[in-house]
Amino acid sequence: MDTFQSLLAKKLSDALASAGLPAAGELTQATDPRFGDYQTNVALVLGKQRGENPRALAEKIVAQLNVSDVSEPPAVAGAGFINFTLWQATVEKQTLDILRDERLGVAETESLRRIVIDFGSPNVAKPMHVGHIRSTVLGDALARVAKFLGHEVIRDNHVGDWGTQFGMVIWGWKNLLDRQALLRNPLAEIVRIYKETNERVSTDPETREACRQELVKLQAGDKENIDIWNECVAFSTQDFERVYGLLDIRYDLQCGESFYNDRLPGVVDRLLKAGIAEISEGAVVVFFHDDPELADKPLIIRKRDGGFNYATTDLATIDYRVNELKADAIWYVVGAPQTLHFKQIFAVARREGYSADLRHIIFGSVLGEDRKLMKTRSGENVPLRELVEEACRHARKIIDEKNPGLSEDEKNDIAEKIGIGAVKYADLSAYRTTDYIFSWDKMLSLHGNTAPYLQNAYVRIRSIFRKADVVAPLSRGESRRHSAVATNIPKLVLNEPAELDLAKRVCQFAEIVPQVLNGFRPNILANYLFELANGFHAFYEACPVLKSEEPSRSSRLALCDLTARVLQRGLDLLGIKVPEKM
């Protein structure tokens, strides 16, 4: 199904060809309704390129434009913008087509790929904390959108389950472990012994050496140490799964660092044989003499003592994902501090001839209301599970005040959807590379750009259908029963400005979703949903639904139905659930 944007873009392309002009500029949704629904800067771009008057070029292009079946005659504005205003009939027909479409007008992408998305990646023997929230919810949202667009997505949780910290964990397990505490709260006890051992290591050379020996034994396959390591991994995985269950996050693979241990020698041998790496001062190193950015930043892939590092593991990971998982693209949703590391890794992979599209998707930090990195009062990282549970408690208080008559089960279910949705949306509505301030009051507000505001718009539509005593708008997973007034009407009537505006916004969902992957920006979708909710509330105030006469009543019910479906689908792509009541 063509979108308004694609229809106009095709006609613009034809007009440029007829005028003997090359393609240039872009056609975008207008940001101000005074300038129509869509606009293009093509004349300004061409004018600058060709040294011609952009307004005269715009008039020349408009003379070749044939858009009479889609929009009013295009208008030239300002220095040379070309503006398009859609016919009411165009909007009515497109809205009706989308109403009957399972995918809400969103076409699958033509260039389908197999994409491995590496996100989350917590460390074993440590609790997940607030620092993991951005990678986790951002990676999940990108995976949901990519899958909806037709890509084959493999979600990989590359957990940190190997490394020097296990020497300390194993020594602490053997010397400091409280078995009763382990039974009560396994991960908390593992964290305690790790912290205590780490403190001893910093001041006691004997403990430091003992921990090193435990690590050597683990790496050599000592049975006792492997058994302890396995228990630590199992306890940590259980804790991860509890958090992921709360957040509705799932993975297809959990290939941690240890999965690649047997592959690391092969990575080094391969790079040495290819002449990509060389031995330097006892270590195996890759130099980037031909890369100005990396020329003074060599990459060690095997240390002098024969040990491997993160670089070796990440190169083995790329090889596995490309050659065994057959990935066309690998997306790493990892914080900005790892930028240099991934530039080096990707440069080595390109030298090896890997053709997969490798992307490092960076993100900013979560700040407290003091604008510093979010911490507990004692200066520790805020545990993620505690943060999520606290969100649900805050939401529950609001529900108790607003709707005390609900049952306990209803209150708990709604609180979970609102609380977790608020946390996710606060993250995803911010541009990913910027820091954002974590504020309970702001993110749980029923006003402004928040998840509860969007959820409330959906709930309000559900209440309209309950009052109308007709089949309500669809929820994901329900049967495909639509009400007669919602889908079987022969025509929509959108005479009022508010309902016409809402219909235009609904139709633009199909234009917005593919844009999310251009720059990996879920905030584009979040901001669209916020504007859609604004449009619905304006429509709700201006256009009576149940009290209006036919054919407006059926038409407005259908528009409500479609708005609810878009809100629900859009929030689902962000990993956010909608309640039926609030």
Annotate the PLM regions.
Residues M1-E92, R100, L104-V471, S483-M582:
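Non-catalytic interaction-recognition regions
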